[in-house]
């Protein structure tokens, strides 16, 4: 931790300005300068984690290799940095309060009255410092907007850290909005000025202003922001919209963001090696080929619910020089008459709950019968089993006990116990609490030889991430396999991890979530081969 330098990223004016992408972009540039870099996300909500939150409320829940259910921004961090992060890279107010209360119950505060300062702020600082061990730089993204009640004590902790570590160890980057008023054809800086004033009132002074704007800012406007916000002129970085989020590091580099960072930290001029990154971004922006994927989901009103999967398709497309277009198909309305003209492949993602299930099953049946490349992920694989049992084996009562605990043929069921990542036995029932009771994180999968899975991964054993409670019931395996649906992946205790259908161009189901390990520089192999198959169809 002694050598670590900290870059705190806050947001002002309004939410959803792209602090996560901004943090990822800064980290990427520093990483390509051969520094050890990581990112920490602070979420100011009181939930322990987002695991039980609705996807429509929070967006995607991203699962780390060590089984933490985290904010979707952790997914961005991993994809930009091309490395695994852990539960240390995300914490919430709920976790902070729980730790402080637990310590108080243990008597660790020696009978003191527990207060926001110093006890809560000390716990925040402890976690930040812990995440910085062994690093040259830790970028810390503070969720929410400056002025929110929920974020006050985080800003106080940042103020204290700067005092403890010294100016040469801390930079504050403030992401703000420069709105464009169409009627007067003007860009307005006043919201940024007021946001910085509020931030300074709380004891935190930014050294870099990252101005989100729909249009470039001229020198006069940049100088105005610099003067009113008390920063150097070259410390006003304009972040206009880009055609791809992966172009943001290049934009920031062109804007000169590394100059004030190097100056503040007393570093030599920074020269990131971005040639390979630039090549992939060019293929995203100007691809040679196109392919259309039918994405059958139920959380379509908030597509960030499927963020990692959307990005994984982009990664695969970049490596195949193809633009992957998504045809969003609402599972609640999908039926045998749904128009699939121009759709090159069908993707059924993971999910929870009974809503939209029959539409997904119908989509799987059509992919099977119409020889469309198909990839089913988690629930998507489970429903592929249900569809096959109903329509090929004739087991009309086949279902998952998630939707009908008394179904005639429980081909997907809740197993009472399983071994977790630490080889500890876990017990779960239909009445178990929802939070933290799933099979979470990275587990090993043994791959059968001569399968599509082996062809994709090119090795006999892989590790992929999971997030589910229900498993495929092996009782009916012999019947499926006699009709051509083969089990090609096994986990611990012979849990079924992957299936493939014979005599089909590409029909694969996986219990794990391959999207969680896909990166721009290294797309997930099974998703890559899925897109390859779709391209051969287009």
UniProtKB/Swiss-Prot annotation:
Keyword terms: ATP-binding, Glutamine amidotransferase, Ligase, Magnesium, Metal-binding, Nucleotide-binding, Pyrimidine biosynthesis
Q: GO terms for biological process?
A: 'de novo' CTP biosynthetic process; pyrimidine nucleobase biosynthetic process
Q: In which pathway does it act?
A: Pyrimidine metabolism; CTP biosynthesis via de novo pathway; CTP from UDP: step 2/2
The signal peptide, as residue positions, is none
Q: List positions binding UTP.
A: 15, 188-193, 224
Q: Which residues form the active site?
A: 378, 513, 515
Positions annotated to bind CTP? 15, 148-150, 188-193, 224
- Residue ranges constituting the Glutamine amidotransferase type-1 domain according to the UniProt record: 292-538
Q: Where does this protein hold Mg(2+)?
A: 73, 141
Tell me the residue numbers annotated for binding L-glutamine: 351, 379-382, 402, 469
Instruction: List residues binding ATP.
Output: 16-21, 73
Please give the GO cellular component terms listed in this UniProt entry: cytosol
Note down the stretches annotated as region Amidoligase domain.
1-267
A family per Pfam: GATase
Which EC class is this protein assigned?
ligase
| MF GO annotations | ATP binding; CTP synthase activity; glutaminase activity; identical protein binding; metal ion binding
Reaction(s) catalysed by this chain, per the record, are: UTP + L-glutamine + ATP + H2O = CTP + L-glutamate + ADP + phosphate + 2 H(+); L-glutamine + H2O = L-glutamate + NH4(+); UTP + NH4(+) + ATP = CTP + ADP + phosphate + 2 H(+)
* Alphabetical list of InterPro entries matching this protein: Class_I_gatase-like, CTP_synthase, CTP_synthase_N, GATASE, GATase1_CTP_Synthase, P-loop_NTPase
UniProt note on regulation of activity: Allosterically activated by GTP, when glutamine is the substrate; GTP has no effect on the reaction when ammonia is the substrate. The allosteric effector GTP functions by stabilizing the protein conformation that binds the tetrahedral intermediate(s) formed during glutamine hydrolysis. Inhibited by the product CTP, via allosteric rather than competitive inhibition.
PANTHER family per UniProt: CTP SYNTHASE, CTP SYNTHASE-RELATED
Q: What's in the misc comment field?
A: CTPSs have evolved a hybrid strategy for distinguishing between UTP and CTP. The overlapping regions of the product feedback inhibitory and substrate sites recognize a common feature in both compounds, the triphosphate moiety. To differentiate isosteric substrate and product pyrimidine rings, an additional pocket far from the expected kinase/ligase catalytic site, specifically recognizes the cytosine and ribose portions of the product inhibitor.
Name the HAMAP family for this protein: PyrG (MF_01227)
Q: How does it assemble?
A: Homotetramer.
Q: What does this protein do?
A: Catalyzes the ATP-dependent amination of UTP to CTP with either L-glutamine or ammonia as the source of nitrogen. Regulates intracellular CTP levels through interactions with the four ribonucleotide triphosphates.
Give the record's family classification. Answer: Belongs to the CTP synthase family.
Protein name in UniProt: CTP synthase
């Amino acid at each position: 931790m002694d050598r670590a330098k900290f870059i705190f990223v806050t947001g002002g004016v309004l939410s959803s300005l792209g602090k996560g992408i901004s943090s990822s972009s800064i980290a990427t540039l520093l990483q390509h300068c051969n520094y050890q870099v990581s990112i920490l996300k602070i979420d100011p909500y009181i939930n322990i984690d987002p695991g039980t939150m609705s996807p429509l409320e929070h967006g995607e829940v991203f699962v780390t290799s060590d089984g933490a259910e985290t904010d979707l921004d952790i997914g961005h961090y991993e994809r930009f940095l091309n490395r695994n992060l852990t539960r240390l890279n995300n914490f919430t107010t709920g976790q902070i309060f729980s730790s402080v209360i637990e310590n108080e119950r243990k008597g660790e505060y020696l009978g003191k009255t527990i207060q926001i300062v110093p006890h809560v702020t000390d716990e925040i600082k402890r976690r930040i410092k812990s995440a910085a061990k062994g690093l040259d730089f830790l970028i810390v993204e503070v969720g929410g907007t400056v002025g929110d009640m929920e974020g006050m004590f985080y800003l106080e902790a940042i103020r204290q850290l700067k005092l403890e570590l010294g100016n040469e160890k801390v930079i504050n980057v403030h992401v703000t909005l420069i709105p464009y008023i169409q009627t007067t054809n003007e860009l307005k800086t006043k919201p940024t000025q007021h946001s910085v004033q509020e931030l300074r009132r709380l004891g935190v002074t930014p050294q870099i202003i990252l101005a989100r704007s729909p249009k470039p800012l001229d020198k006069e406007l940049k100088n105005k922001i610099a003067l009113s916000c008390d920063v150097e002129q070259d410390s006003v970085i304009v972040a206009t919209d880009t055609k791809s989020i992966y172009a943001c590091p290049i934009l920031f580099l062109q804007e000169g963001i590394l100059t004030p960072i190097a100056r503040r930290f007393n570093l030599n001029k920074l020269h990131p090696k971005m040639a390979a990154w630039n090549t992939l971004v060019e293929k995203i922006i100007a691809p040679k080929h196109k392919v259309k994927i039918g994405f059958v989901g139920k959380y379509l009103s908030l597509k960030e619910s499927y963020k990692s999967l959307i990005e994984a398709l982009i990664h695969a497309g970049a490596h195949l020089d193809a633009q992957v277009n998504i045809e969003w198909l609402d599972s609640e309305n999908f039926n045998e008459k749904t128009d699939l003209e121009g759709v090159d492949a069908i993707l059924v993602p993971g999910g929870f709950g009974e809503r939209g299930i029959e539409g997904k099953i119908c989509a799987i049946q059509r992919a099977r019968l119409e020889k469309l490349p198909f990839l089913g992920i988690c629930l998507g694989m489970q429903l592929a089993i249900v569809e096959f049992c109903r329509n090929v084996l004739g087991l009309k009562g086949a279902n998952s006990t998630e939707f009908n605990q008394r179904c005639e043929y429980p081909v997907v069921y809740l197993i009472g116990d399983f071994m977790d990542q630490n080889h500890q036995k876990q017990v779960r029932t239909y009445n178990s609490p929802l939070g933290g009771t799933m099979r979470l994180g990275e587990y090993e999968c043994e791959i059968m030889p001569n399968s599509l899975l082996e062809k994709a991964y090119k090795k006999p054993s892989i590790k992929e991430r999971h997030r589910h409670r229900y498993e495929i019931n092996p009782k009916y395996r012999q019947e499926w396999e006699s009709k051509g649906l083969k089990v090609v992946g096994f986990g611990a205790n012979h849990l079924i991890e992957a299936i493939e259908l014979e005599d089909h161009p590409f029909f694969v189901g996986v219990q794990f979530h391959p999207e969680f390990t896909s990166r721009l520089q290294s797309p997930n192999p099974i998703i890559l081969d899925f897109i390859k198959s779709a391209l051969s169809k287009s």
